């Protein structure tokens, strides 16, 4: 049994349900997707849909609710914004699910990720390590966005995994944490992940050191697809090569991270990403094909499940 957690409000349900469908079509064994619902509409909709292996979780409860007076992830005024509260749920949500459901392990996955290969590939690569993280390849250290990405993170519910998890949670909820205002509070919960490897080196696996890499807008220009259908790639020496054990070999890219993807379903168009580091990736016809397919998949999901969203439109769609 694979345990997975994601989150969104109602407006992003089409992305979360696309993730769910991609997992259902690629997973070799049963999985449960725990869905942290950021508003009442998303919680009601998922309960009404009653989809197999998808468990809606109400975040308006003691262990997960937002404290409007709290500072999440940073002591700057921005720490009181809703998005910083959302950042806190990566760690708090995992901790809550471990406690409530006695899960042996879990993957936290952003809702705008889509799997093309079995998630079991990630579990096999991490082996016995208690925590597994993906490095950024587009920027060298130091960087304000952090050397690692929180789009996919794996935790075991054991002493080593919980030591890291509790540390991460404290970073994002405790304004007196010593790493606040020390250069690690610059990108929500993400920059703190750099500390995992430094403080808990024996517990951490870094993806990219073996067979798997992270597909994302900021990484695509460093990859060459050898087999697009199987998502087999090689990559050139990226700026963040020191974040991995750089080896000239073939890798599997089991998922794409469609971050900043904004569709306009009514006009059959979309903006692929708001990623500032690289807007050239859509020049690659294979990447553009993947984005076209993702748009159509999300549109089908939205129509099939009767979703409507005020945020599913963009002012200027770039691709049609």
Predicted regions located by residue number:
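N-proximal low-complexity "stem/linker" segments adjacent to membrane-targeting elements
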Residues: 1-17
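Short, acidic, metal-binding catalytic loop of nucleotide-sugar glycosyltransferases
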Residues: 22-30
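Glycosyltransferase specificity loop/lid
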Residues: 33-51
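Active-site-proximal specificity loops/subdomain of glycosyltransferases
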Residues: 51-99
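GT-A fold catalytic core of metal-dependent nucleotide-sugar glycosyltransferases
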Residues: 87-138, 154
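Conserved catalytic core of nucleotide-sugar-dependent glycosyltransferases
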Residues: 119, 123-178
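Catalytic core and acceptor-binding pocket of nucleotide-sugar-dependent glycosyltransferases
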Residues: 160-264, 268
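Long, low-complexity C-terminal extensions of enzymes
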Residues: 240-320
């Amino acid at each position: 049994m694979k345990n997975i957690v994601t989150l969104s409000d109602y407006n992003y349900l089409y992305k979360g349900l696309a993730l769910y469908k991609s997992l259902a079509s690629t997973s070799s064994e049963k999985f449960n997707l725990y869905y942290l619902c950021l508003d009442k509409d998303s919680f009601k909709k998922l309960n009404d849909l009653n989809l197999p292996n998808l468990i809606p979780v109400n975040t308006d409860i003691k262990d997960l609710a937002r404290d409007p007076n709290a500072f999440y992830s940073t002591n700057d005024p921005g720490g009181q914004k809703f998005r910083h509260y959302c950042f806190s749920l990566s760690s708090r949500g995992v901790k809550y699910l471990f406690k409530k459901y006695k899960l042996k392990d879990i993957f936290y996955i952003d809702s705008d990720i889509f799997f093309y290969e079995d998630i079991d590939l990630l579990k096999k690569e991490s082996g016995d390590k208690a925590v597994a993280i993906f490095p950024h390849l587009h920027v060298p250290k130091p960087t304000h966005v952090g050397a690692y990405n929180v789009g996919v993170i794996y935790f075991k519910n054991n002493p080593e995994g919980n030591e890291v998890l509790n540390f991460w949670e404290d970073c994002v909820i405790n304004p007196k944490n010593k790493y606040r205002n020390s250069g690690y509070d610059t990108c929500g919960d993400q920059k703190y992940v750099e500390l995992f490897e430094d403080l808990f080196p024996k517990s951490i696996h870094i993806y990219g050191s073996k067979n798997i890499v992270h597909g994302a807008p900021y990484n695509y220009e460093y990859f060459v697809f050898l087999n697009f259908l199987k998502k087999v790639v090689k990559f050139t020496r990226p700026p963040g090569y020191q974040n991995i054990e750089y080896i000239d070999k073939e890798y599997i890219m089991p998922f794409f991270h469609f971050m900043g993807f904004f569709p306009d379903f009514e006009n059959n168009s979309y903006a692929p990403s708001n990623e500032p580091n690289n807007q050239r990736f859509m020049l690659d016809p294979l990447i553009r094909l993947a984005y076209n397919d993702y748009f159509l998949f999300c549109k089908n999901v939205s129509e099939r499940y009767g979703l409507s969203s005020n945020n599913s439109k963009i002012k200027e769609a770039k691709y049609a």
